[in-house]
Amino acid sequence: NIVEPINIKATDAFDFLSKKDDSHLIDTRSDIEWKSTGIPDLSSINKETNLINWGPVLDQTFFEQYKNFLLSSFNQNDNLLFICRSGSRSLIAAQFAIKFGFENSFNIFEGFYNENDQNWKKNLPVKFI
């Protein structure tokens, strides 16, 4: 059985993160993106955004480090919500999280900062690092 990540809207993701103690947000963009457009600000719900620089090289070493990060940072029953610019990298990150045993993985398909009006940056708190 192949389990696919659950697609979730940005506003629903924020609501979910605020209500579920075992939920975590993982931003899979690059450090350049984080610095230029900001990151999701979860301080109002007493949480921090987890940052994973996704790429530019996605080789075996990267995926081993990614797996180790997930296993050392979260419980496998936790709810992991992944976000990137437009929903593509976060989908891949969530698919691999499921492969590594984190079946409660979500993809914020509207992304952080894409062309549609429903993205995180337009509707939800942002902070700059």
Language model: regions and residue ranges:
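Rhodanese-like catalytic fold shared by cysteine-dependent sulfurtransferases
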Residues: N1-H24, D31-N79, S88-I129
